[in-house]
């Protein structure tokens, strides 16, 4: 069984963090890299209800498209809803990895999947920022 680091390595090979817009904060938010990953739950948003479902199903990792945080956070005491989400995930041994604008921009990412679905032929980037 792969551990969290191995799963993250695959995710970040497919969806490199360097593809993220400057304002975005994708990647591993919560998790112990040495923990084994048996079950993964996917969702659009890391809402409290989604966290409940991930915990109830025994997920070791929750992968969401939208981030839990858009700005720097200086505490996760559990007093706010984001802190509560981090606390609950940590207590139940469930990691959280976010693939947002990096997943949008990656080859075979969200943008490419949408283009394929709609049968688009001439495809280009909407961002002026050059990718490294």
Set out the residue ranges of the language-model regions:
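Hydrophobic structural segments
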Residues: 1-131
């Amino acid at each position: 069984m792969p551990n969290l680091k191995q799963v993250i390595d695959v995710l970040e090979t497919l969806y490199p963090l360097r593809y993220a817009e400057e304002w975005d904060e994708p990647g591993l938010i919560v998790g112990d890299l040495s923990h084994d990953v048996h079950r993964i739950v996917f969702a659009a948003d890391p809402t409290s209800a989604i966290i409940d479902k991930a915990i109830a199903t025994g997920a070791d990792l929750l992968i969401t498209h939208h981030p839990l945080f858009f700005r720097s956070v200086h505490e996760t005491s559990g007093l706010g809803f984001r802190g509560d989400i981090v606390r609950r995930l940590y207590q139940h041994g469930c990691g959280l990895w976010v693939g947002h604008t990096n997943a949008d921009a990656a080859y075979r990412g969200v943008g490419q999947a949408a283009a394929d679905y709609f049968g688009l032929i001439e495809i280009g980037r909407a961002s002026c920022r050059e990718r490294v």
